[in-house]
C-alpha cells in the first residue's frame, strides 16, 4: 500500500466535509494568472468539498466561428463586459478562484480530489493559433466549433468523425512562491497550473506542493477531450463545472506535482526543453519507486525502462510537459 493511497483513506475517514458552490463571476475570476498576492474569493477547511463553475472562450470569436449567439453563456458575456483590462494577468485563461484552504502553508502538499466533472454547454471549440507546435506550417488562425452530444458522450468533429468525450480541466493549480509575482497562466510549473494532462479526469487526484499560505487554488481551461501533445495549442475547449475535495498534508513533501488514477500513479516533468522535461520526469519516477515502493535506485531505473511509459503531455505551453504512467498492477504481488 503506497503512501498516496494511505493518505487518501485516512483523510476520507477522519475529516468531516463541508460543501460549497462557487459560481464564476467577474468577482470570482482570476484572468490569466496564478499569484501568491491574490485575495481569496472563498476560504475552506481541509477536507471540504467545492463545486466550481468555469467558463471558456471569447464571445466575439465564438460568434465569428459560427456559434449561435444564444448558446454563449451569459456568465461569459458578463466577464468580458465587466472585467477591466488592468485587472487581467499576462495569460489568457479564465480561472475561477482563488480558493484558500485553511492551514495550508509552504512545504505542505495539497491533495485535490476531482470527484466529478460536468459538461455545461453543447459545444466545444478548437482554435488553431499562431503559436502551435507547427506554427511555421499553419500560420493562419482558425476556430472550429465542435458540437457535443452530451447524452452519447461524443463530439461531432465533422465529416463523419466522432470523438469520445473525456472531460478534464487543463489548468488546476495554486499560487507559486511569493517572489515569482503574478505568473502567466500559460506555462505550468511547480505550482501545477496549466498542466494540460488529459489523464486528470473525474475520479483522479492531483498532488501539488504548496508555496504560499492557503495554497490559493484556481481552476479553468475546460476540455471535452485532447490528444497528448495538444499540437495546435488548444484542445476541445469548453465550459465545465467540477466538484473538488481539498486535503492538506503537513507531513508529505514533493518537489513537483504528482497524480493518481484508479489504475496508475503519475509523475511529471516540466521544462522549456523537452529533453530536460523528460529527464525530470524520469528522475521523479525513480524517486517515487524508491521512496514509495522501496526499490533500489538501480531497480527503479530498470523498471522505468522496461514497464513504464513516459508520454508527452503537451508541446505548446512554453514550458513543455512529460508524464510517466506507472501501472498499479506492477505491484500487485508485492507484500503489503
Where do the PLM segments sit?
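Short, Lys/Arg- and Gly-enriched loop/turn segments at beta-strand edges
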Residues: 57-69, 117-127, 214-224, 314-316
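Extended, compositionally biased flexible segments
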Residues: 57-58, 62-102, 114
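Sec-dependent N-terminal signal peptides
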Residues: 4-14
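Conserved mixed alpha/beta catalytic, RNA-binding, or beta-rich assembly cores of soluble enzyme
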Residues: 165-275, 286
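Alpha/propeptide regions of enzymes that mature by internal proteolysis
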Residues: 20-29, 35-51, 56, 87, ...
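Intrinsically disordered, low-complexity linker/loop segments enriched in Gly/Pro
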Residues: 90-94, 100, 115-201
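Short, basic/aromatic beta-hairpin or loop at an interaction surface
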Residues: 18-30, 70-90, 172-186
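Long, compositionally biased
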Residues: 318-336
Amino acid at each position: 500500500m503506497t503512501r498516496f493511497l494511505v493518505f487518501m483513506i485516512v483523510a476520507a475517514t477522519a475529516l468531516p466535509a463541508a460543501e460549497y458552490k462557487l459560481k464564476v463571476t467577474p468577482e470570482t475570476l482570476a484572468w490569466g494568472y496564478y499569484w501568491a498576492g491574490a485575495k481569496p474569493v472563498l476560504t475552506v477547511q481541509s477536507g471540504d468539498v467545492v463545486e466550481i463553475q468555469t467558463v471558456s472562450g471569447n464571445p466575439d470569436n465564438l460568434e465569428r466561428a459560427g456559434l449561435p449567439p444564444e448558446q454563449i453563456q451569459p456568465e461569459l458575456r458578463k466577464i468580458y463586459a465587466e472585467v477591466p483590462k488592468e485587472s487581467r494577468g499576462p495569460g489568457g485563461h479564465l480561472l475561477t478562484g482563488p480558493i484558500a484552504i485553511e492551514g495550508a502553508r509552504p512545504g505542505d502538499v495539497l491533495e485535490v480530489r476531482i470527484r466529478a466533472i460536468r459538461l455545461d454547454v453543447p459545444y466545444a471549440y478548437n482554435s488553431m493559433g499562431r503559436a502551435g507546435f507547427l506554427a511555421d506550417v499553419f500560420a493562419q488562425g482558425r476556430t472550429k466549433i465542435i458540437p457535443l452530444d452530451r447524452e452519447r458522450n461524443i463530439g461531432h468533429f465533422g465529416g463523419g468523425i466522432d470523438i469520445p468525450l473525456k472531460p478534464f480541466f487543463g489548468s488546476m493549480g495554486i499560487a507559486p512562491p511569493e517572489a515569482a509575482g503574478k505568473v502567466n497562466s500559460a506555462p505550468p510549473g511547480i505550482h501545477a497550473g496549466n498542466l494540460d494532462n488529459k489523464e486528470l479526469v473525474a475520479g483522479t487526484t492531483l498532488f501539488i506542493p504548496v508555496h504560499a499560505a492557503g495554497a490559493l487554488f484556481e481552476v479553468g481551461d475546460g476540455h471535452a477531450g485532447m490528444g497528448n501533445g495538444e499540437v495546435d495549442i488548444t484542445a476541445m475547449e469548453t465550459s465545465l463545472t467540477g466538484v473538488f475535495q481539498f486535503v492538506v498534508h503537513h507531513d508529505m513533501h514533493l518537489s513537483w506535482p504528482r497524480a493518481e488514477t484508479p489504475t496508475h500513479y503519475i509523475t511529471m516533468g516540466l521544462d522549456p526543453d523537452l529533453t530536460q522535461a523528460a529527464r525530470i520526469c524520469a528522475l521523479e519516477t525513480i524517486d517515487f519507486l524508491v521512496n514509495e515502493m522501496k526499490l533500489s535506485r538501480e531497480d527503479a531505473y530498470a523498471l522505468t525502462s522496461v514497464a513504464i511509459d513516459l508520454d508527452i503531455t503537451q508541446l505548446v505551453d512554453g514550458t513543455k510537459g512529460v508524464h510517466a504512467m506507472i501501472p498499479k498492477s506492477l505491484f500487485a504481488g508485492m507484500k503489503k
